[in-house]
Amino acid sequence: MAKPKRKPAREKPAPRRGERVRHILGESLKCFAEQGFERATYDDLIARSRVSRGSFYWYFPSKEALYEAVLDYCVSGYVARLEAAYAKTDRKTHAVKRVLDACFADFDANRTQYRMLLRPPPNAKAIGKLRQWNEDVAEFMAGKFAPLVAAGKLDSGTAKILPDVISAFLDGVCVRLVLDDERSVSRLEKNIEAFLCKIVEDGRA
């Protein structure tokens, strides 16, 4: 009796280009966050991504090109994430608290990205992207305080400097977050919130 023919095993489909690039960016982000740009070698990045050297070079011909792509990956959609987090906050609470809660939520959800962003950037182009990122965040904050100025609940001078003040405080929180200093982070968040809400006396919309 003839044995039934075995069905050929289905080959696992190769990841599509978009999926492969996202995978490389995600793994390279972790590598840059852990080692920094200078210490991370091209071999480290290839090994971490587990793709062939040829494929890796095809997508990213240099470490600099890869870093720029990872940096874009980190900051693209950042303000949109803040807007989404802000929309989930209680509209009846202080505007400063709402802004802080949105930023803290993003810090907590994307610590690896912040670890990389705190590393020294390798060139002027990267510095320019980080500068633009900071300006976008300041613009987001200013937009949340503008209605308070219009309603006479916040003077325009305070509203103008408040985004920079909040950003400076957030930088301190960010540093402690990437160090996983949870107790210190919790205390710092509460103290920042209490201090700024006291300065901006009536920050409810």
Task: Describe each PLM feature range.
Residues 1-19, 204-205:
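N-terminal intrinsically disordered/low-complexity leader segments
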Residues 2, 23, 31-65, 69:
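Helix-turn-helix
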Residues 20-28, 45, 70-74, 78, ...:
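Generic hydrophobic, amphipathic alpha-helix propensity
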Residues 69, 83-109, 162-166, 189, ...:
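Hydrophobic alpha-helical connector segments
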Residues 76-79, 109, 126-151, 160-164, ...:
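Amphipathic alpha-helical packing segments from all-alpha helical-bundle domains
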Residues 107-128, 175-179:
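Amphipathic alpha-helical segments used for helix-helix packing
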